[in-house]
Amino acid sequence: GGTSAWSGGMIWVPNNPHMIAAGIKDSREEALTYLQSLSHDLIRPELAESFVDHGPEMVSWLEENTSVKFQLVADFPDYHPEHPGGKPTGGRSLECPLISFNDLGDNKDRVTVGYNYGTAPITMKESHLGSAVPIKVSATEHTRRAENDERGCGQALIGHLYRACLEAEIEITTSARAVELITENGRVTGVVIKKDEEELVVHARGGVILGTGGFEWNRELVRDFLRGPMTSPVSVPTNEGDGLVMCMRIGAALGNMREAWWMPAVEAPGDRGDGLNPTYL
């Protein structure tokens, strides 16, 4: 795991309550038009509608019922604002505020740290990636945050969610690899996990949500699916397509398999993909 913890930590939610509160106009129709244009009309309308309709509800529910909080990444535009329904001035991107990992107690070391953002005590809107003119953080404030182990970006997103899980007494199992989906009468009812060389069965009442990252470190899947070579992945090295493989084994339908979040990269000599050395320039 660790894809989200290594990331910039932003979530994309059209018509979210924070942009509405800031006076930024958006609508269900604009968001659906944007998604339809981006997908070249290949998107499943019912899935797009569910995402657009329930995304703002998700943000409100988390903030009202847990300690998770979000804030606008001011002026961060949609990735393709030139498409119909796109927002060139931003508003749809949210991030979690800084969080002290001391709040997680003995659990804080269970959150993996990547080399993209590390444990940097800054938010996206305070970085050059999140703003053309980032909010300046004084050296004194930066030191205070570091001493309090305050983290931003993907660490903040996972930190907020993890803290909420701990407060709700939700059990989190780490170092446990999902290896097989259990099906009964055409429905997924559980998952087999492997922990410490032992296979355990976890049954699900409502279903199984797969959040297993990508498959960019699986050379066979990259060769079979992507539209071009990927020579230098810059993500968690354990992203080997476990969820995808499990789905294919039970005959799940696949779609949009040729694309990735492409970016130019130059692999640094001696890189081991574990964050000990920079992996791209």
Language-model features: locations:
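Residues forming the flavin
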Residues: 1-31, 70-74, 79-281
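Active-site rim elements
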Residues: 44-49, 234
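Flexible glycine/proline-enriched surface loops and loop-helix/loop-strand junctions
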Residues: 34-45, 227-230
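Acidic-leg catalytic submotif of subtilisin-like serine proteases
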Residues: 66
